[in-house]
Amino acid sequence: MTMSRIASLVVAGSLAAFGAQALAQEKLTVWWTKGFYKSEDDALFEAIKKFEQRSGVKIELSQYPVQDMIPKTVAALDAGTVPDVAYADVYDFQVTGKWAFDGKLEDLSEIIVPQKNKFLPNTVETTYLWNDKAKKKAYYAFPLKQQTMHIEYWVDMLQAAGFTEKQIPTGWKDYWKFWCDKVQPAYRKKTGSRAYGIGNPMGVDSSDSFYSFLTFMDQYNVKLVDDDGKLLVDDPKVKQGLIGALKDYTDIHASGCTPPSSTSWKDPDNNVAFHNKTTVMTHNATISIAAKWLDDANNATLTPEQRAQARKNYDELIRTAGFPNKPDGSKPIYRAAVKTGVIFEAAKNKRRAKEFVSFLTEEDNLTPYVEGSLGRWFPVTKLATTRPFWQADPHRRAVHAQFTAGTTTFEFTKNYKFTIVNNENVWAKAMSRVINDKVPVEQAVTEMLARIKAIAG
């Protein structure tokens, strides 16, 4: 072989190696929560396809169930093998603030600041977090969508029990008694079915349980932290409010008004019980319950009869509503949870990761993604809330009305240690103390407050 031939092969080999390396650098690893239904995932896939076509970057997408996302991400952080971009429905509740504090997240201010004015109040602010390693606050996450608490009930089950929607009380105590003391026994007597008045999430491994409980707490006007994140748990009014909320919440189980299994429910389980008509009503932090039937109605793989029944369920038989008035008679208050994605400080391809996040948060890309969830998530941008989508049916109008009336934020947006409180789920553990260990409500609250002080003080 001639020297020139050898040189040519060496050059060719070097170019091939360089090309392979360059190609490898143009891959982006993305981890994402799997959607509740097909249309939600399809909307994500479409956004990814558009980004790939625009950028030439190949996205390697991995999707996981909501309950698996945090364990998998924590394991990746420990192993030093993090994805470039990650999103989970419960990051905001349990880990985003802690990761920011520990210096594990990339500063996204260059992406967020130029478009800050397009976001609704109490949305982008929740991603402005303290990094104790860098000793600064910055935008360490990106907001995608938000949720709040709703009531869902079966109109036909209510009617079968002999009641109309106009008979549903608006007062706090009367409202919960109505489903437990009137609807449940009447429905069982009329139908012979052992259905329950309420689906009441109480599982320690469920974000629904603490979101629902905190909504009860809000109606008792309890504030656990001030605007600077300082604990207010030594205020006697806080303890009394928590006692009222915990008693009301656990009384539903004590009266036999929720399935016994609800003490160990995970996030999808109250949905499943509702869809099976095991429960007449449930509270849920999105309208995924109603939207599931809309997704079925649009599912070409189902029979015409199944699709017709799904459409009837969505249009006629399921109602989305707000909570009753507070115990003091004032209007209910709703806390919004802003769903956050992150880029890790240890990500291998941060430049392309930031390009993807910037692309996804553009109005033309974010809005179709949010609407792909069929109303399960509410927008974080002002313009998206004005679209006809949110006036298209009674479920979406109800969601829109709740958000436009104004919402409040979670404690972890002011004190990151409440992500640890929520991750430990001291709220559901207090429920368990009352229900399973038979301790008085006041004792369970005292123990809960002591634990909150130990974690977040």
Positions of predicted regions on the chain:
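Glycine-centered hinge/linker elements that transmit conformational signals in sensory
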Residues: 176-184, 227-263, 319, 323
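Long, aromatic- and glycine/proline-rich binding clefts that accommodate carbohydrate-like moieties
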Residues: 122, 126, 134, 312-323, ...
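Hinge/lid segment of periplasmic solute-binding proteins
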Residues: 91-153, 209, 221, 307-323, ...
